[in-house]
Amino acid sequence: MQNGANSRSQEYQGVSVDSRYDPQAIETKWQQSWAAAQLDRTPEADDRPKFYALSMFPYPSGNLHMGHVRNYTITDAIARVKRRQGFRVLHPMGWDAFGLPAENAAIDRGVQPADWTYQNVAQMREQLKQLGLSYDWDREVTTCSPDYYRWTQWLFLQFFEAGLAYQKEATVNWDPIDQTVLANEQVDSEGRSWRSGAKVERRQLKQWFLKITDYAEELLQDLDQLTGWPERVRLMQANWIGKSTGAYLEFPIVNSSDRVKVFTTRPDTVYGVSYVVLAPEHPLVTQVTTPEQQTAVAAFAAEVSQTSELERTAEDRPKRGVPTGGFVTNPFTGQAVPIWIADYVLVEYGTGAVMGVPAHDSRDFAFAQRYGLPVQPVIQPTEGAIAEPWPAPFTEAGVMVNSGQFDGLSSTEAKAKIIAFAEEQGWGQAHVQYRLRDWLISRQRYWGCPIPIVHCPDCGPVAAADLPVQLPDSVQFSGRGPSPLAQLEDWVTTTCPSCGKPARRETDTMDTFMCSSWYYLRYSDASNPEIAFTKDKVNDWLPVDQYVGGIEHAILHLLYSRFFTKVLRDRGLLSFDEPFKRLLTQGMVQGLTYKNPKTGKYVPSDRISDPSQPVDPDTGDRLEVFFEKMSKSKYNGVDPARVLDRYGADTARMFILFKAPPEKDLEWDDADVEGQFRFLNRVWRLVQTASQVEATTAADDKAEKDLRRAVHTAIQAVTEDLEEDYQLNTAIAELMKLTNALNDAPMPGSPAYLEGVQTLVLLLAPFAPHIAEELWQQLGGERSVHLEGWPVLDESALIVDEIPLVIQIMGKTRGTITVPASADRDQLQQLAENSEIAQRWLDGQTIRKVIVVPGKLVNFVIASP
């Protein structure tokens, strides 16, 4: 590398240098240069350690928002640092391109979903390139491309062959006007269709599921391996899996040979059962309902069937029920207890039946209070008894009472003994249950990956022979009736791959999470036309070393991806247990928001005439002002294109990375954006100066050492900030400190000064790649700054020869002197006593005591007059 004063006139990779900081021109120039040089292409396997940096890929809506910019900039900075630290890096990008918005566009605008999607992909790809993100575009994947979804279908068949994909009846949202199935997001808060306005009905439909419950225990236990994940995310997944240890208990139905089977985590409370509840959909409801209760039970069941699962299980919603008139016998007490149906019991969860113990469960207590059901205490506190009637349920551990042979035991001990007794008597057995349910992947949509199954009257569901099963082109969309695929008779009609007889294709498509549950695997071998990925390549690059994405994906996407990985491992397709070593959930980008507290309406900032005293221009009401997540509905978003047009991508990146730690929410502030632009201009001017000065020999050895110490302190601090927790904001703060030190340097052109300027540019490059590339050329760089090694710390430069020593008299600071860093206690005391400060303040005084704190201060204690 050269220091050359004439570097401005140099040509670097055929690109000329401008003496004025023009971000738009610089960024366009270098983006074109990097693309031509394939600077970001992923290297083949070699002896270097690998690093796989991955951002969650976006849905191609057509425009980037600031949340995207933050996610991708964080990951890009990490990838750029790792490349220069000697890693071979995989840093890809793609598109989660199936989904409902494209189908809605087809209905509303008359465009084909594929055309709408690919147009958006092209637009967003260009926006990403404008940010200077170092993606290997040769590995781009688009989930709606047949080249991709043929492998999604192939993976589905892996599940099918393993017995992990199956069909069963499940409830869907049905629009009675449009005669079509609705996704949950198409149903408003009042339970109406967003398009027709009809009251949505709940119907049973045969659907495809994946047996994720077969992996529930492993998914739970392996969370302990994920030490690089936020504890919050691991806890969310553990709660979603929801392991419960307890028992199945069976209650014989009076006048029947059948039994009601319940699961309970509190078998110690079984003597306190005062009723049993079935889900309205439970298959035994008809049998246990008496003629007198048939009308009431049928009406209640019909009403509940139109209520969403979320509503039925909401904590703050009163629990409602109806007695069936039937009874079961509590086998432990021999007493008959009534059977009810209630809205809060779901047939899909557990056995679809629960035992009601009002004395020891809050929900049961509220239900019993509402319907006048008896409360029978069977556990008392260890110390002191609760007087009846009980004012509230006692839900903690205690001593067994009213429980026959188990009286006097601790409730904890009684659990095991009651389960053992039930097993001996044939009334129940120990059982572990999970809240997690099998994954419903069927969607009655066109714009999704077709499920590659053929339904044969003789053979049943059979795997399609030829993949991909492609979506038909030029489909007409009305938003009414069955799935568009189901209406295409020519497409549906086929022959059975097994027996050759007439058969029909599956017309459901897959949940889009199917496509995103394995895309990170495809990146390892993205262009392979013969297989989804080779075992060698996927085992080479995976697991992902750093995954970056929003907390909103903490459960479904991440859990499904973990499930996919484990199934494919068991199928022999890969050799690791978990897909993502480390996870960073970046905070939200928040915008300044104006809201009328009286009307609840949001007001756009461009309608505010006086930001210091904002009022609603329509009503004159004083507005509330606060920061909230950017969204169109709140009029608080900032268009990335506007920021790039005004300041350039490097300024946007610097602001995004500096404003807040990656995991914290970021409040958008135009003034701070301007501040980053000014900082980059300062760096620009600094390098202009450095590129013109002649190299000199330092005359002031102390100043040179101090400056070199500042340079290597910056190297140390920035490197540490970029390890493990990626504190990118404090790393940029260190660059600002170094810039100040260089601007204050007494001798521009000295070796330490020139080393410092070069180091500043090298450290700046991951954050602001375009300006760093331009400045590196001005400093005489012979190749791209992004190919240069990471600056190496010289620990000897951090050694301090002299340190400040505070002089105190009676604990009050009177001044500071400079002393050798190696001085011992006696030397420090002597230097302090001989200082001008001490001479002035101690003149005529008697020193009673001297306190020396090495490296910090000397305190003189004087005798009282």
From Swiss-Prot:
GO molecular-function term, one example from the UniProt record: leucine-tRNA ligase activity
Class of the enzyme per the UniProt entry, highest EC level: ligase
Keyword Oxidoreductase recorded: no
Enzyme Commission number: 6.1.1.4
UniProt-listed SUPFAM superfamilies: Anticodon-binding domain of a subclass of class I aminoacyl-tRNA synthetases, Nucleotidylyl transferase, ValRS/IleRS/LeuRS editing domain
Subcellular location(s) per record: Cytoplasm
Domain of life: Bacteria
CC annotations in GO: cytosol
Catalytic reactions of this protein: tRNA(Leu) + L-leucine + ATP = L-leucyl-tRNA(Leu) + AMP + diphosphate
Keyword check for Aminoacyl-tRNA synthetase: yes
A Pfam family reported for this protein in Swiss-Prot or TrEMBL: tRNA-synt_1_2
Gene3D superfamilies in the cross-refs: HUPs, Isoleucyl-tRNA Synthetase, Domain 1
Motif extent ('HIGH' region): 58-68
Chain ranges for the short sequence motif 'KMSKS' region as given in the UniProt record: 629-633
Binding-site list for ATP: 632
Any one GO BP annotation for this protein: leucyl-tRNA aminoacylation
Keywords noted in UniProt: Aminoacyl-tRNA synthetase, ATP-binding, Cytoplasm, Ligase, Nucleotide-binding, Protein biosynthesis
PANTHER family in UniProt: LEUCINE--TRNA LIGASE, MITOCHONDRIAL, LEUCYL-TRNA SYNTHETASE
HAMAP family (alphabetical): Leu_tRNA_synth_B
Family the entry assigns: Belongs to the class-I aminoacyl-tRNA synthetase family.
Protein name: Leucine--tRNA ligase
Source lineage: Bacteria, Bacillati, Cyanobacteriota, Cyanophyceae, Synechococcales
